[in-house]
From Swiss-Prot:
Belongs to the LipB family. The record marks K143 as: Lowers pKa of active site Cys. It comes from Polynucleobacter asymbioticus (strain DSM 18221 / CIP 109841 / QLW-P1DMWA-1). This is Octanoyltransferase. Its EC number is 2.3.1.181.
Length: 214
């Protein structure tokens, strides 16, 4: 079945969240899957396992939104590629654990296309910078991409976020994913100058290869 890809630009978090929840609630076995690629204005989101105390330095300029995805607290903002994956997992024949693994591999492959080596970390979904030449030691082990999913009626929503040229100061206000001291980095800080549209397209290609192999 064809997957509908939507490039939404910069869109409000809460309204987008409400639309994807409604889409998932109303879809049926014949509803085409959708992939939404977008950016959000600055917002902190707190997942089902979240502790609001992990927002240790609140900002009057950045709202905190409680959401129904898995995981802890994270930040979304301009310069970060957000991809929402509205997929019928039963139809694709993918279980949640396999979905996470495939998303992570798509992110690893995307970063590799731009000369960056990255890796998974057991027990901590997301993608982290690996030891490699040309990267400052302070960024080894830093988180460059995050995942957070919700599955309802065998259908996924929410998705992933890849930091391209993001406000890293905002991440300094939280314990990302609940881990105190975890550093967050973006591709620009790691020396990648390609624009966000180029990186978004490459990420989309890798997601399609991983999730909808021909």
């Amino acid at each position: 079945m064809t997957v509908l890809v939507k490039h939404l630009g910069v869109v409000d978090y809460v309204s987008t969240y409400e639309v994807m929840r409604a889409f998932t609630k109303e879809r049926n076995s014949t509803t085409p899957d959708e992939i939404w690629i977008l950016e959000h204005p600055p917002v902190f989101t707190l997942g089902l396992a979240g502790d609001a105390g992990n927002l240790h330095s609140p900002s009057n300029q950045i709202p905190l939104v409680q959401v129904d995805r898995g995981g802890e607290i994270t930040y979304h903002g301009p310069g970060q590629i957000v991809v929402y994956l509205l997929l019928d997992l039963k139809r694709l024949g993918i279980f949640v654990k396999e979905l996470v693994s495939r998303i992570e591999q798509a992110l690893i492959n995307t970063l590799a296309d731009f000369g960056l080596v990255a890796e998974r970390r057991s027990g901590a979904p997301g993608i982290y910078v690996s030891l490699q030449p040309g990267i400052s030691p302070e960024w080894i082990g830093a988180k460059v991409a995050a995942l957070g999913l919700k599955v309802s009626k065998s259908c996924s929503y929410h998705g992933l976020a890849l930091n391209v040229a993001t406000d890293l100061e905002a991440f300094g206000r939280i314990h990302p994913c609940g881990y105190e001291g975890l550093k967050t980095v973006d591709m620009q800080t790691l020396g990648i100058k390609d624009n966000i549209d180029t990186i978004s397209q490459r990420l989309l290609e890798h997601l399609q290869k991983q999730l909808m192999p021909t």
